[in-house]
Amino acid sequence: MHDLFIYGTLMPGLRLEAEMHGAERLGPARVPGRLVDVGHYPGLLHGEGTVTGEVYRVSDAQLARLDEVEEMVPGDRPASQYWREQVTVLEGALAGQPVWTYVYNQPVDGLTPIAHGDYRRYIREVGRDS
């Protein structure tokens, strides 16, 4: 089993929530980093700030499926839209523990920062569906 931090369209009530079917929700959390608006989903980047999301426990098979959803090509970082990395939870579920998350792995020039790091709040503010 793997602990995974999600922060965008995989969260409950958002567009890709069905991809999390069968995963165990551990609760809300915050991790270090910053968010950008990639178009119809966010991208987490390394940097100052915090990102709001949720932690789930997933099986090996679920994690492999989520790698596909996030367009992560194992062993080929340059070809991957996101890259799965470990981060340490700052607050909330599993605080102080390492968890997997998907870090955006493409150029970010021209992308809009999501300064507060909360994708749910952001889509409400800009009036966008997930």
Regions found by a protein language model. Give the residues of each.
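Glycine-aromatic micro-motifs
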Residues: 1-130
